[in-house]
A protein has these predicted regions:
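Short functional hotspots at interaction and active-site rims
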Residues: 1-183
């Protein structure tokens, strides 16, 4: 059966409230001091990037498991309905919850996942190959431009910073189109 597929890359990420210090320019002989939050808190995102348009969609699950992955896929499908006559080719890594998601939807073909099955064909990346998933670059750039070398006094401040960064990429844009296309 011949069908038209739209490529979509998916992955999850945590952003920690702890300050991450990276290289920077400092006056010779000076030692920079960087504040750091005294706790271990994080905010989590499940992201989908469409290289054809450069659009980024994110959901905010509390934790990562097959149920939250399925919820995230459904949220993506509501926000980005599949065009008539097409399906999404959803590229995922080998996280255990991704394997279970794919098994339940495609292999066991459970009826409660028919809505996803008719819209999505899954593609599994080879093990240990984050370099083949361009959404990893989205996470890297977001950290580099928004969270590295920055002190966040609260988790809500970190979340609003990351949300604002992702909002810029929610509409079609050339930056993600270029970043997420293999040439």
């Amino acid at each position: 059966r011949s069908e038209s597929l739209i490529l979509v890359y998916q992955d999850e990420v945590h952003f920690q409230i702890q300050t991450t210090v990276t290289a920077g320019w400092y006056k010779k002989g000076s030692a920079p001091t960087v504040k750091s939050f005294p706790g271990r808190f994080k905010t989590s995102y499940s992201g989908f990037v469409i290289p054809e348009t450069g659009e980024l969609f994110t959901a905010k699950p509390e934790k990562f498991n097959y149920e939250t992955t399925i919820d995230s896929i459904r949220s993506f499908l509501v926000a980005h309905p599949v065009p008539e006559g097409k399906r999404y080719a959803l590229v995922m890594d080998n996280a255990p919850w991704h394997k279970k998601t794919m098994r339940l939807i495609e292999v066991e073909a459970l009826p409660e996942y028919e809505d996803i099955r008719k819209c999505v064909a899954f593609i599994k990346l080879p093990p240990y190959s984050p370099d083949l998933n361009p959404i990893e670059q989205v996470w890297r750039i977001t950290r580099r431009e928004n969270t590295h070398n920055v002190f966040f006094s609260s988790l809500s401040l970190l979340e609003s910073t990351v949300d604002s960064a992702f909002e810029v990429w929610a509409s079609p844009n050339d930056q993600l189109r270029s970043l997420c296309t293999f040439k």
